[in-house]
Amino acid sequence: MDYTTKNIINFDLDGDNKKEKLFVISNVFTTESPKDIFNFIFVVKDNNISILKKDIETYDKMYNMCQAYVAYLVDLTGNGTYEIITGCGYYSNKEQCIEMYQLKNKKYQKVISCEDE
């Protein structure tokens, strides 16, 4: 399978001195013709998976989708845990979609959404 994005970020997101794995996997804008087009962003900690972003569409909707990426990891609140700011870029010149996820009760939750704009 052809991925247009596959990144793994090793980073201590929650301040426990252990690095979590943050995965970004996408096949949006692939040169192949897969049945489905997808974006996934997820965190793996202690063999548990927390999905932040999951978009799946049929191939014919590929150019209506955006390609997900991690834009920033930043501790905005100063509490030692990092917010995850993601972006999603379109093939055309549409505006980028920016979302933010924050660690609450040991799970990342979306606190700023593209739908909020």
Each PLM stretch: what is its role?
Residues M1-E117:
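Beta-propeller-forming repeat regions
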